[in-house]
Regions:
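Glycine-rich loop at the start of a catalytic domain that most often binds anionic cofactors/ligands
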Residues: 61-76
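Disorder-to-helix initiation segments
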Residues: 1, 182-207, 272-288, 319
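Short, hydrophobic/aliphatic alpha-helical segments
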Residues: 31-51, 121-136, 178-183, 188, ...
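N- or domain-start disorder-to-order transition segments that initiate the globular core
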Residues: 1-49
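Acidic, low-complexity proline/glycine-rich segments
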Residues: 2-12, 175-195, 255, 259-270, ...
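Active-site cavity-forming subdomains of large catalytic enzyme subunits
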Residues: 84-92, 96-246
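Accessory "access/gating" subregions that flank catalytic or transport cores
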Residues: 226-319
Length: 319
């Protein structure tokens, strides 16, 4: 099953399918129209020669330095080259794939000003298995994953290195072998490619998915322990959960009852005179439920972030 990105509806399961199972990716027609509109507006700003951060000016401390339209493409290319300064072990290919997907989705919001050609290139890299080599250390966090995103995007412009069909190659060669034309960046596009939180969001997406599985495994372990110790399921009664209605607790209790449904061991001691089980058994839903609630909170934060535009500046085309 493929994943169609539109800048608004991407989910953690979508990220997992693309990152780990190589699900094909496409761009929605509505997203393409938004992208084209914002890109055209950047061209308009460039012609007006108005001071726009990162478009007609330098970056950071050089924000007051005026850049001529003739130099805008060089400015964007140099931005990627200068920020590719990461160190440390390389990120796994599955994380790099998630990064490419999330940055393409962020650009699809239509507030970045990059052309659809840039997004199409990132999607082609995903679909054809071109995986940039990205050092794991160097992000500045809330100000953006500038360094790791720069390493990721270098390959799109024919620089850096990438893994393609198991072989690590110069970026230009990897793109050529995959049959993907490299991008000649235009105004705003280098900044649009690296000014975001997609590296931390990619790692967070996969982590939330994996820890959700661990929450299920924890319930299985609790159910097996209750069975082995001939415990009672009375503490998992829905009425108990309704009296203290934390969502995660109720979900864990329901799961425990489902896991032990029809158990011969459970039936054999249904009328056992024991008053209650050990705390570690009867309070499993409360403990596991707190973890479930935390995971659900993280899920909402990550999915909200992955469907957000994180650029500076944002582009709001004039009506």
């Amino acid at each position: 099953m493929g994943v169609c990105i539109d800048g608004a509806s991407l989910s953690i399961p979508d990220v997992v399918r693309v990152a780990r199972r190589a699900a094909p990716v496409s761009l929605s027609p509505d997203a393409r129209r938004r992208i084209d509109r914002a890109s055209a507006y950047v061209d308009t700003l460039l012609r007006r020669e108005r001071p726009v951060y990162g478009v007609t000016t330098g970056f950071g401390r050089f924000a007051d330095v005026v850049i001529s339209p003739d130099d805008s493409a060089t400015l964007q290319r140099n931005l990627l080259l200068s920020h590719a300064s990461g160190v440390g072990e390389l990120l796994p290919d599955e994380v790099v794939r998630a990064i490419l997907l999330l940055r393409a989705n962020a650009l699809s919001c239509g507030y970045s000003g990059a052309r659809a050609e840039v997004v199409d290139t990132l999607i082609a890299m995903l679909n054809r298995g071109v995986h940039p080599q990205v050092p794991s250390q160097g992000s500045v966090g809330s100000s953006g994953d500038l360094a790791p995103l720069a390493h990721t995007m270098l390959v799109a412009i024919g620089e850096g290195t990438a893994r393609y069909k198991g072989e690590v190659l110069p970026g230009a060669e990897a793109m050529a072998r995959a049959g993907i034309p490299v991008v000649a960046l235009r105004a705003k596009e280098g900044l649009a490619l690296i000014n975001g939180t997609q590296v931390m969001t990619a790692i967070g997406s996969l982590a939330v998915h994996d820890v959700s599985i661990l929450a299920q495994v924890a319930d299985i372990a609790a159910a097996m322990t209750t069975e082995a110790l001939r415990g009672t399921t009375s503490a998992f009664d829905p009425r108990v959960q309704a009296a203290r209605p934390h969502p995660g607790q109720a979900a864990s209790a329901r799961n425990l009852l489902r896991l032990m449904e029809g158990s011969g061991i459970r039936e054999s001691h249904r009328n056992c005179p024991k008053v209650q089980d050990a705390y570690s058994l009867r309070c499993a839903p409360q403990v596991h439920g707190a973890a479930r609630d935390a995971i659900e909170y993280a899920r909402h934060v990550v999915e909200r972030e992955m469907n957000s535009a994180t650029d500076n500046p944002l582009v709001f085309p004039e009506d």
